[in-house]
Regions:
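A phosphate-binding catalytic loop at a beta-strand-loop-alpha-helix junction
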Residues: 1-4
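Short alpha-helical oligomerization interface
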Residues: 6-10
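A generic secondary-structure signal marking the coil-to-beta-strand transition
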Residues: 11, 59, 86-87, 114, ...
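Conserved N-terminal catalytic core of the sugar/cofactor nucleotidyltransferase
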Residues: 13-14, 18-92, 101-103
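Conserved core of the sugar-phosphate nucleotidyltransferase
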Residues: 73, 97-169
Length: 169
């Protein structure tokens, strides 16, 4: 994303004049989420200043700051003290989506481990991240009826998921 991210963290890049992070905060609030944890690493001070406590959006935001970029799982583990004991929704703030977050907040979706939102493979990731076999996420090397060598059964992680805290224990 350089040069766009040379002085701006990806979550603060704008789409239609609005930062990506704000798009998510507003849509999450519209889905009924009022308590959020925002993870910040690269240029974290800008994200901290932008979010504040969340009051301007009618939500409560707690900030988790990574000492250095830890990738998705590392950032979640760092934020665990703020996330509590119930399943929680994770949205990568550097994506733009019209996904209906409320669909993941239903009790029948709350996982014992994790529930990943997968999408068709984009051109830049044709091999995908996972195979989906019998509604179970599997490593991309496993194939269902499509057979070995077929990419038909592979999908890409969207950056949206619901996790149970035990998944990271």
């Amino acid at each position: 994303m350089r040069p766009l991210t040379a002085q701006t963290p990806k979550p603060l890049l704008t789409v239609g004049g609005t930062p990506l992070l704000e798009h998510h905060i507003v849509r999450l609030r519209e889905a009924g989420v009022t308590q959020m944890v925002v993870n910040a690493a690269y240029l974290a001070e800008q994200i901290t200043n932008f979010c504040g406590d969340g009051a301007r959006w009618g939500v409560s935001i707690s900030l988790s700051r990574e000492p250095m970029p830890l990738e998705t799982a590392g950032g979640i583990i760092e934020a665990m003290p703020l996330l509590g004991n119930a399943p929680f929704l994770v949205v990568n703030a550097d994506i733009y989506t019209d996904f209906t977050y409320a669909s993941l907040l239903r009790k029948d979706v709350m996982p014992a481990c994790g529930h990943l939102v997968l999408v068709q493979n984009p051109e830049h990731n044709r091999a995908g991240d996972f195979s989906l076999i019998d509604n179970q996420v599997r490593p991309p090397g496993e194939y269902g009826e499509a057979g070995r060598g077929s990419l038909a059964g592979t999908l890409t992680f969207s950056g949206i998921a619901v996790y149970h805290p035990g998944f990271f224990a």
